[in-house]
Structure formats: structure tokens, C-alpha cells
Amino acid sequence: MKKKIAIAMGGYSSEYRISINSGNIVYKHLDHDLYEPYRVHILKGEWFVVADDDTPYPINKSNFTVKINDKVIQFDCVFNTIHGTPGENGLLQAYLELIGIPQTSCDYYQSALTFNKRDLISVLRPYGIKAATNYFLNKDQEINTKEIVDKVGLPCFVKANRAGSSFGVTKVKTEDEIISAAKTAFTEDDEAIIESFLDGTEVSVGVITYKGKVLALPVTEIIPDGEFFDYEAKYLGKSQEITPARISEEDTKKVQDIAIMIYKKLKMKGLSRSEFIFHEGEPHFIEMNTNPGISQASILPQQAEKAGISLKDLFGSTIEAALNQK
């Protein structure tokens, strides 16, 4: 009998449209001979299954079931493609764990940790992971711009601490710009992190569990048309993404080994993508995406293709890993 797979997409953040694209890619490429997939939209106001004729059927949140044509559907697994809250910050994972449904992304603790830029870097530093100097802000605290500049220098990046797809990110070149940049960050989160500028080559490393083994995918070099890899660069084609990256074999292995080490130390599972900048010859960690985009414009599918892994095989392996951990 085919396993019933709920493809969770949407979410409560600015990234919900990206997530819908990712979820539809999974629905399209998943092997329908092996699985019975359902598109589950998880939005602030309602959770519902979208049928092939676009009819919405509400999800029963008490047990994550849906009633279609008088038949109650119980899902065997959730393929989590939600970027941002609640699918990438641990909330959905915790809910599914409580009701006993396996899901494809990392567990709730790892999800919450990796979604918090400050906390993740604090955990990784003792392992020798290099990262930019940073300064943390709460929304209600007074902003001392001189103290910030003294610590991180200029230019710097002001970011929402818990947001993805470069929403709420501003590159700041003068001290006078810090206040307005912080306000932009606070539209996405009530915490902000300010990081020193790292000059160098930016790369992205996909690390996945594929057929039972942790695997680093070919490294992608990112060259944004603008000043940094923002939303438009990521999803509107305003960047060059070169796979494999134009770095030495030694540097490729170095950054892949670090990405795998992070994945294993954090006890990750499923799909992930970590970003680094080679600054002064050494990879500096930027962030980790535990539900990376898998739309046509996304990096991870490009990397999988270069590794000879089809999306059908990638998604199938991800589901089987989740089912086997039930």
C-alpha cells in the first residue's frame, strides 16, 4: 500500500510564497507510484489540503488528519517544505512529534537552534568554526550606534536574528544608517544581529542524508548582482550561481568537511544547506538552512543534479529516512 505523504508548505512568514513553490516541486517530482502525496497548505488562518481540482479540505489539527469525500486520511509522513515559522523554527516539528507523525526535516531542538543566528554561532564557535564578529539587539533596547561600530566595524550587516531568505537584511555603510536598518530587521523579528563585513568568496554547501549516508553535495559559488545575496538575488535570478564553485580542490574539501562536521555535531537529519564566506583564505560560517529552498531557482536542486541525484531519488530517500526513524 502506498504511504500517504503530507507535503507541508506555506507558513506564517514572508517566505510563504517560496515555500509554496518548493512544496509544489516535491509534489511534482515525488514518485507517485510509491507514494500518495497531498499538498497541505499551512497558513496563519487555516490549514488545509489542496486537491487536484484546487478544492480545499480543512486539516483536523487535533490529529493532523483530513476528511475527503467522507473518508478520513491519516498521513504516514510529513515532507516539510516550510521556510520560516512554523516549519523551520521547531514549532511544526514539536507538534508532529507529540502526535507521532514522522517528518523529513531536523528535530524541533535543532530546528529552533539553527533558526536563531546568534545562538547557532555561539554553539559552533567552541568547535573552531570561524564566523563574523557580531552584536545582538532586542527590539525594545536603546541602540548605541558608536558601541556597535566599535565592535563590528563598517560596513556591516544588520539582520533579523530569526528569519530566512535574507528578509530584514541591510548592508550598512555609515553609522547613521544603523537605526533605520535595525527598524527594517525588526519588521521580521523582535531580535536583530549585526555582523561585521567579510570580504571574500561566498559559497553554499548542501549536506544531506542520502540512502543512509551523510553526503556533502558539490559546492556552489554565489556572485550576487547587488552588494549581497538578498531575496532578489536568491529567487529573482539576480545572481550568478556556479556549481561547482571556482575554488581549489583543497578549499572545496575543507568547506565540505566543515559543513559535514556541523551537520553531525548538531545531530541533523534530512536536507540542509550551509553558507560560508572564504575570508582571508578561511571559510567563515554565515548560516544554516534546515529546510532549504527546492524550487526551480534554488541552489540545492542544482547541487543534487551535479552529484547525479534526481529530485525523485532525493525526495524518496528523504521520506524513507524519516519513516525508518519512526
Swiss-Prot record:
Keyword check for Cell wall biogenesis/degradation, yes or no. yes
- Keyword annotations from UniProtKB, A to Z: ATP-binding, Cell shape, Cell wall biogenesis/degradation, Cytoplasm, Ligase, Magnesium, Manganese, Metal-binding, Nucleotide-binding, Peptidoglycan synthesis
Record SUPFAM superfamilies: Glutathione synthetase ATP-binding domain-like, PreATP-grasp domain
EC number of the protein: 6.3.2.4
| Chief place where the protein resides | cytoplasm
Q: Which residues bind ATP?
A: 149-204
Tell me the compartments it is located in.
Cytoplasm
The family database entries (Pfam families) matched by this protein are listed as: Dala_Dala_lig_C (PF07478), Dala_Dala_lig_N (PF01820)
Q: Which cofactor does it need?
A: Mg(2+); Mn(2+)
Concerning PANTHER family, the annotation shows: D-ALANINE--D-ALANINE LIGASE, D-ALANINE--D-ALANINE LIGASE B
Protein name as catalogued: D-alanine--D-alanine ligase
**Protein species of origin:** Christiangramia forsetii (strain DSM 17595 / CGMCC 1.15422 / KT0803) (Gramella forsetii)
Gene that encodes it: ddl
